[in-house]
Amino acid sequence: GCRWQLFAQNTELQGGESKTWRFNGRFKCNFKANIKANLKANLKAKEPAPKSVVLATTTLTYNADYLSQCHVIPWVSFASPPSSIASIIERGLNDDDNFFNKREKKDVFGWRHYGEIDADHEALNAEVPDEFISHYNNQYDPLLGMTLQFLQGGDLRWLALIRPLQQHIQDIDIYDTDKDKAEYNGGLMWHTDHYLSAQTCTHRSNSKYHEHAYDGFLGGGGPGGQHCYTSGLTLQYWLFGDPSAKQSVAQLCAWIRNFYNGSGSLLERTFRLLTIDIKSNQLTNIGFKAPGYKYPLDRGTANFIIALIDNYDLTAEPALVLEMATIIRHTFHPNEDIGLRDLKNVEQSWFYTIFLQAVVRYLLLKESLEEIDSDYWYARDGLIHFGRWMLNNESYYLDKPQQLEFPNDTWCAQEIRKANIYYYCYYFCSDHNPQYLHQAKAYYEYITQRLSTSSEAVYTRVLAILMQNDGVEQVFLGHPPQSAVPYQRIEHGAPPKLTLTTAIKHFLFDLFRLSANFSLAREYRWLAIRLKMLMNT
């Protein structure tokens, strides 16, 4: 018989990796005319005829006005003039150190790494930066950011970066297995730890040469809740109909749920009681959890909410919206004493801003569904409560560099989160406080002025943050919008307090609930994996 040997017989894979092979074919009736037209166009432009002219594909761009009007991505606008940070973002395409040239410098063309973005910011203090390899693993969702840029202006160079990146994320960065711990299975691999060369670790785990950096298991290397990005993958399904992207979103959503809520094991729930629930103001394996709350006020919880939102956008399952509300209620409170959060300890708590951004997306979703209920008002009042605190207490991170471990311009890029929160606090606040608009504009001016002259502005992490958060400023140009939902005062009661009695009560309730689906195999598996790890250390 006839055999098509299109693909290599053997492909080296590490745990949780996969390899997707694709080939393109084209069938066109007016085949010769198409070739002649392309050749004629190239000759007229005095350009050589491309070898791929026969397999050239048609690429469609989207009308920016239409995208803005239909609110398919409701928290940004595409129809307005470019944002104030657009020229900085465009350096990712036009600068000498653009994304394409970064790939060339590091020779990132092997199948495992192709599409990956070079984490050049980690080489800031390296002796030989061009020989420093660090894996980025989609931190701050550049897949989303680049896709938003493609939709914003239709520049096909973004598309040339997006397509291999999304395949790399699905094949390599996502830990596609069910044979590890539940809090690892199906998760997104963490980026290489800061300012360390990847050495021998590829994308999978810590290198043996990193032992000094992982004391106390605080370093990167494996899946962790604070590194979960689903929005870029969601857009790949919406725009290109990629079913594997949709499946990856569902998988990441299930993983991060297991990471924070557990897999249903009674032993696991008991372990959480001892290591997380009864601890107060301490760093735990899910993050820094304030007394009385189940979830930490950080980017991990934000990622959990965003994953649920993205999964809902793809499936329309109502239970996901209720789950978002439950997480928000167990993370902050509209009447809490924010001073107890120690938010001025920037290194430990700056990512509360990412949580507030997730609350904004939840509120916009609730408004689009016309679900104006107690969950909506809890989240809205909580957002404004923290927004007022920000007006009176927040300042630029780099104004106090002594409070930062690495005072570089990544901190300047992170200011865009505060700016966008201020904009949406204006949108949701009942008194239409103009201070929110003033602060938002001031922050954008600060970011633009500083990064326009910064040599660090072209670094991958800086650009990823800006791209991920671009588009909000345009929403508020001209006549700034305000929520059409009339304000309604709701009593939210007192914020929760941590006591041993309440922790044990919640524990016993969970044991009763979990016992309904008790599985001896699940309990054995949970214990066996951990005993095996202990024996190997």
Q: Where are each of the predicted segments found?
A:
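Eukaryote-biased recognition of C-terminal alpha-helical segments
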Residues: 393, 397-429, 441-492
